Each structure stands twice: as structure tokens, then as C-alpha cells.
């Protein structure tokens, strides 16, 4: 399965009409029972156990209600999403469809967003609607996503198109724009790999895999690399079966080149201890467990704790210069301590220039740093920088003295002592290096 970084789809399943009254059901327009006509004498004649015929409303009534509701009520996107979510949780799938149709009928040009058409497509499916309507809803979703240029919307709609097997050309456009806007995220690249697999496009596959493997992925690097290799091999096999052997061999050759890494560093040890790597990169950034990836392409993809006694740093596409490796001690059990560690350093891994070096690092109170110099690095540009939240220092509020104690009228600042001072508000601490 391909990991996804968007919300999950609405629950699917047949609509269920509860037998008991549902207190959470939305208001509905119910027709009145037909009035009984009184005879000329002014009396109403009845028959014992007479059943009064009342025509029951059908599903069309809920559509009429929400159409009328949104004709006179304006609602924010957040409120609509909350309403749709609650209806879906309560398995009121026809109401989900009716709400979205009513809203989009009146606000499609002014308030509509891509997710609304995605939800509409799912609602049509849940209510066993026709495939043509689902396709149309996703077409509108794609148009909205493309107009928004929001990478989350682009990825979400592209994922829906691939899931349904619709309009691969449009899905490709959405994926390509998203991957350019967020090159540090894996989901657009994984979707591009899936699209290449479905369309048997070796060029797209090679480009997506190369971009994916040009970075380290903290917490899942080996799984992502394994997935990419598997997808390439399966596409190459399919190409061979279609008589496209030359394209298959070219694709496999590209994979070998993409899997190579400029810098690979691994630290291992024996004993009850935990150690992390901190690598100072040539242009000034530091990769460590707290900030695992830098804008220069390096990443701490694994930190050893407990029985997993291994920490790994990779920089598949690196800038030239000195890489200073420091070992941070997280803990070291005095009863079963780790006394030394093995540091494995590989440059130009998987190429004819590959160089391996192994060092034994004594794990004393002070651990000397190790410097590795790289030449021939393949990185040409930095990744986009996303600033972390700004730390704010708020001074501790002190209780102001009373007027009697001070002997004078309190100043406005003393009267509002709980408000942070202008010096404290917005104070920015230096980023650790």
C-alpha cells in the first residue's frame, strides 16, 4: 500500500434507515395528513379503528429541504465539513449527498473547494449512483485543485483519480505540480510511481524514483527504497512481456544509478545504551534526531534505542565539503554499558568511486568528532525551508500592589500586569546548530 498524507475517505456502505426515531437526524419536511371533510351537519363521522391514510415522504424530501436551506443560509467551508462528517459518522449517506448537492447548487462559484467535490463523488458511490456522476464530480474537483495550486488538494484529488482509474492525464498534471511545490514530501512521488506503473511509462517511473531516492526519509527510508525498487522491477518485467526489452533495460540501469548515495554513515554498538548521530553539513546546517532533515539533503533516518543499536545518517545527493560527525549519548546503562562503537562511513556508495572506512569510537565522557571530506557531490539545489514555530517567552505575572500600599494611583501597566510585556512578546530564540 502507498502511504498517504491526506484525510481518509468517507465511510462507504449501504444507506441504513433506522426503525426508531433518530434524535440526530436533520430536520425534514413532512407532509400533513389530509384533512377530513366534515359533513353538512357539522359533525365528523368516524368508523372504529379507522386508519387515516398518510403519504410518507421519500428520499427526495431531504434533497428539497437542503436545497431550500442553502438558498437562504450561507455557511463556511469548516461548518459544512463538520456537518458532512457528523452525518457520515451516523451513516446518513443520503443526507451527505443531499447536503453537498444543496450547498454546491448555490455556492459553487463563490465558496466551493476541491474537497467538496471529492466528498460528493464518494457520496454518490455510497448511494450506489452512476459512474458518470462520479467522474463528473471528480472532474470538478480536479479543476478546483488545479486552480488552487494547493499541494494538499492536488495530491488528494490525484489520489482519487488513480484510485478510480479515471483520467490519468489530469492525474499526472496534478501530481507533477504537487511534486514541484513540495519536493521534500514523498506522497506526490509515490503517486507518480503508481501512475507510471498503471500507464507503463518507464520515463515517468525513472524520474519519480530518482527524485524519491535523492533524499533520505526519516523513520521509513529502507521501506521507501525497497518499495521503489519493487515497482521498477515489476514495470520492467511488464515491459519485457510486451516486447519492450530495450526500455526495460534502460529503466533498470537508471534504478542502479538512482540507488547510489554520496554519503552514508552508520553507528553501531554493543551494550544497554542509546546513541544518536549529529552531522554538521558543509553549508552550515546540522541533521540530528530532533531536526532529522536539512535543506541540503542530509537526514538522520534512524536512531538506535533499546535493542535497536544502530543510528544512520544519509545524504544521497550531497554538496561538496566537510561533514563533521558527532555522537550524542542519549543514555548509557552503567550496569551494562556500551564501551565503544563502530562508525562506518561510505562515500559514493554504489558507484565505481565507492570508498568505505570503518572507525572504532571510544564511548567515554567526551567523544571526539570525526570529519569526512566529500568531493564530487551531486546536489545542485537546496530544498524549500519551512520555518519552525517561533518560541515566545512570556514573563511570569506578578500581583500588583494595591493603591494603599503604593500610595498612588496604579499605572496602566501595573493595572494590567498579567499581559506580557512587549519585550517578552515575540522574543525569538536562536536556532540550535
Q: Model-derived features: where do they sit?
A:
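Compositionally biased, proline/threonine/alanine/serine-rich low-complexity intrinsically disordered stretches
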Residues: 1-73, 391-433
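Alpha-helical segment of the N-proximal tetratricopeptide repeat
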Residues: 45-61, 65-110, 115, 119-129, ...
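Alpha-helical repeat scaffolds
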Residues: 62-66, 95-104, 131-144, 168-179, ...
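Short coil turns that delineate tetratricopeptide repeat
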Residues: 74-75, 108-111, 145-149, 182-183, ...
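Alpha-solenoid helical repeat scaffolds
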Residues: 81-82, 114-119, 151-157, 186-192, ...
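Residue at a conserved register position within TPR or TPR-like alpha-solenoid repeats
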Residues: 87, 107, 123-125, 161-162, ...
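Long amphipathic alpha-helical scaffold segments
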Residues: 201-264, 283-286
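Intrinsic-disorder/low-complexity signal
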Residues: 240-417, 424-433
Amino acid at each position: 500500500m502507498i502511504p498517504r498524507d491526506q484525510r481518509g475517505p468517507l465511510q462507504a456502505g449501504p444507506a441504513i434507515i433506522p426503525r426508531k426515531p433518530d434524535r440526530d437526524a436533520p430536520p425534514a419536511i413532512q407532509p400533513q395528513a389530509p384533512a377530513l371533510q366534515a359533513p353538512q351537519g357539522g359533525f365528523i363521522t368516524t368508523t372504529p379503528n379507522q386508519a387515516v391514510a398518510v403519504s410518507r415522504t421519500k428520499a427526495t424530501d431531504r434533497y428539497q429541504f437542503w436545497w431550500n436551506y442553502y438558498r437562504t443560509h450561507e455557511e463556511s467551508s469548516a461548518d459544512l465539513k463538520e456537518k458532512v462528517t457528523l452525518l457520515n459518522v451516523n451513516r446518513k449517506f443520503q443526507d451527505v449527498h443531499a447536503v453537498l448537492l444543496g450547498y454546491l447548487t448555490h455556492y459553487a462559484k463563490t465558496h466551493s473547494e476541491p474537497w467538496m467535490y471529492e466528498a460528493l463523488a464518494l457520496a454518490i458511490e455510497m448511494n450506489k449512483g452512476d459512474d458518470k456522476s462520479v467522474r463528473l464530480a471528480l472532474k470538478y474537483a480536479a479543476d478546483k485543485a488545479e486552480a488552487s495550486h494547493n499541494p494538499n488538494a492536488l495530491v488528494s484529488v490525484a489520489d482519487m483519480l488513480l484510485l478510480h482509474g479515471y483520467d490519468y492525464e489530469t492525474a499526472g498534471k496534478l501530481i507533477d505540480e504537487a511534486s514541484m511545490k513540495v519536493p521534500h514530501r514523498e506522497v506526490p512521488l509515490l503517486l507518480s510511481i503508481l501512475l507510471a506503473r498503471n500507464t507503463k511509462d518507464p520515463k515517468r517511473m525513472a524520474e519519480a524514483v530518482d527524485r524519491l531516492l535523492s533524499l533520505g526519509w526519516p523513520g521509513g527510508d529502507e521501506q521507501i527504497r525497497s518499495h521503489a525498487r519493487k515497482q521498477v522491477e515489476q514495470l520492467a518485467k511488464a515491459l519485457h512481456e510486451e516486447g519492450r526489452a530495450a526500455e526495460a533495460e534502460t529503466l533498470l540501469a537508471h534504478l542502479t544509478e538512482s540507488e547510489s548515495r554520496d554519503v552514508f554513515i552508520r553507528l553501531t554498538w554493543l551494550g544497554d545504551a542509546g546513541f544518536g548521530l549529529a552531522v554538521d553539513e558543509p553549508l552550515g546546517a546540522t541533521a540530528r534526531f530532533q531536526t532529522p532533515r536539512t535543506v541540503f539533503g542530509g537526514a538522520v533516518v534512524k536512531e538506535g534505542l533499546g535493542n535497536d543499536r544502530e543510528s544512520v545518517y544519509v545524504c544521497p545527493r550531497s554538496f561538496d565539503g566537510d561533514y563533521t560527525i558527532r555522537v550524542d549519548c542519549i543514555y548509557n546503562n552503567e550496569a551494562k554499558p556500551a564501551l565503544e562503537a563502530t562508525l562506518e562511513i561510505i562515500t559514493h556508495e554504489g558507484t565505481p568511486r565507492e570508498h568505505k572506512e570503518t572507525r572504532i569510537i571510544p564511548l567515554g565522557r567526551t567523544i571526539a568528532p570525526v570529519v569526512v571530506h566529500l568531493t564530487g557531490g551531486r546536489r545542485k539545489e537546496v530544498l524549500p525551508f519551512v520555518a519552525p514555530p517561533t518560541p515566545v517567552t512570556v514573563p511570569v505575572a506578578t500581583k500588583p500592589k494595591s493603591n494603599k500600599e503604593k500610595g498612588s494611583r496604579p499605572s496602566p501597566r501595573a493595572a494590567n500586569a498579567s499581559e506580557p510585556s512587549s519585550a517578552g512578546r515575540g522574543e525569538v530564540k536562536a536556532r540550535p546548530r
